[in-house]
Amino acid sequence: MNSYFTNPSLSCHLAGGQDVLPNVALNSTAYDPVRHFSTYGAAVAQNRIYSTPFYSPQENVVFSSSRGPYDYGSNSFYQEKDMLSNCRQNTLGHNTQTSIAQDFSSEQGRTAPQDQKASIQIYPWMQRMNSHSGVGYGADRRRGRQIYSRYQTLELEKEFHFNRYLTRRRRIEIANALCLTERQIKIWFQNRRMKWKKESNLTSTLSGGGGGATADSLGGKEEKREETEEEKQKE
């Protein structure tokens, strides 16, 4: 609590009707004779308790708008309140700016690794090749060999026993039934026909020369038939 305050019992009147409060400290000895009087005003002025320098309005009365060392009235209270609110607003603004800066820095820290990953160039030899699906990356990479299950091989052998050449529609049906691609069915049948030709040629050579000629003619017919079938599929 401040030691300076306005005491109505210590005011004195001037000729113009204005009250003038002398700037005297609370612990001053000049207040001691006046503290026990109930009256104030003209009687206090007649007693002349204070010396003449304290009655000079030019020296003691503050007319400027700036706050003096003893200006503790209502205006100063509101000024302090406004200053306190401004300080709080500045503090809140500083806190929000700090939080925004932290969020921005964290976002930059997150996006930096992603940018680094995107900027890394991946070459074909760095990618992994799937040997089971037969899908490889790069033109110079050798495709992996497809591994067929026992059930798939059995169904394909049955189909090959009845039809050595498949139409596109039948190939799609078998691929959907065996969970394979159309290309895998086509490659399997091509390989199976080549194997069948070799087996037929081998049996013909073992049986005799005449049989070998007939086997060769049959092999040539099979090759021509295969070529025509592939041309039809391309069309």
Curated annotation (Swiss-Prot):
<keyword id="KW-0217">Developmental protein</keyword>
<dbReference type="InterPro" id="IPR050296">
    <property type="entry name" value="Antp_homeobox"/>
</dbReference>
<dbReference type="InterPro" id="IPR020479">
    <property type="entry name" value="HD_metazoa"/>
</dbReference>
<keyword id="KW-0804">Transcription</keyword>
<dbReference type="GO" id="GO:0000978">
    <property type="term" value="F:RNA polymerase II cis-regulatory region sequence-specific DNA binding"/>
</dbReference>
<keyword id="KW-0238">DNA-binding</keyword>
<dbReference type="Pfam" id="PF00046">
    <property type="entry name" value="Homeodomain"/>
</dbReference>
<comment type="similarity">
    <text>Belongs to the Antp homeobox family.</text>
</comment>
<keyword id="KW-0539">Nucleus</keyword>
<dbReference type="InterPro" id="IPR001827">
    <property type="entry name" value="Homeobox_Antennapedia_CS"/>
</dbReference>
<dbReference type="InterPro" id="IPR017970">
    <property type="entry name" value="Homeobox_CS"/>
</dbReference>
<protein>
    <recommendedName>
        <fullName>Homeobox protein Hox-C6</fullName>
    </recommendedName>
</protein>
<dbReference type="GO" id="GO:0000981">
    <property type="term" value="F:DNA-binding transcription factor activity, RNA polymerase II-specific"/>
</dbReference>
<dbReference type="GO" id="GO:0048706">
    <property type="term" value="P:embryonic skeletal system development"/>
</dbReference>
<keyword id="KW-0805">Transcription regulation</keyword>
<comment type="function">
    <text>Sequence-specific transcription factor which is part of a developmental regulatory system that provides cells with specific positional identities on the anterior-posterior axis.</text>
</comment>
<feature type="short sequence motif" description="Antp-type hexapeptide">
    <location>
        <begin position="122"/>
        <end position="127"/>
    </location>
</feature>
<dbReference type="GO" id="GO:0005634">
    <property type="term" value="C:nucleus"/>
</dbReference>
<feature type="region of interest" description="Disordered">
    <location>
        <begin position="200"/>
        <end position="235"/>
    </location>
</feature>
<dbReference type="InterPro" id="IPR009057">
    <property type="entry name" value="Homeodomain-like_sf"/>
</dbReference>
<keyword id="KW-0371">Homeobox</keyword>
<dbReference type="InterPro" id="IPR001356">
    <property type="entry name" value="HD"/>
</dbReference>
<dbReference type="GO" id="GO:0005654">
    <property type="term" value="C:nucleoplasm"/>
</dbReference>
<feature type="DNA-binding region" description="Homeobox">
    <location>
        <begin position="141"/>
        <end position="200"/>
    </location>
</feature>
<dbReference type="GO" id="GO:0005829">
    <property type="term" value="C:cytosol"/>
</dbReference>
<feature type="compositionally biased region" description="Basic and acidic residues">
    <location>
        <begin position="219"/>
        <end position="235"/>
    </location>
</feature>
<dbReference type="GO" id="GO:0000785">
    <property type="term" value="C:chromatin"/>
</dbReference>
<dbReference type="GO" id="GO:0009952">
    <property type="term" value="P:anterior/posterior pattern specification"/>
</dbReference>
<dbReference type="GO" id="GO:0006357">
    <property type="term" value="P:regulation of transcription by RNA polymerase II"/>
</dbReference>
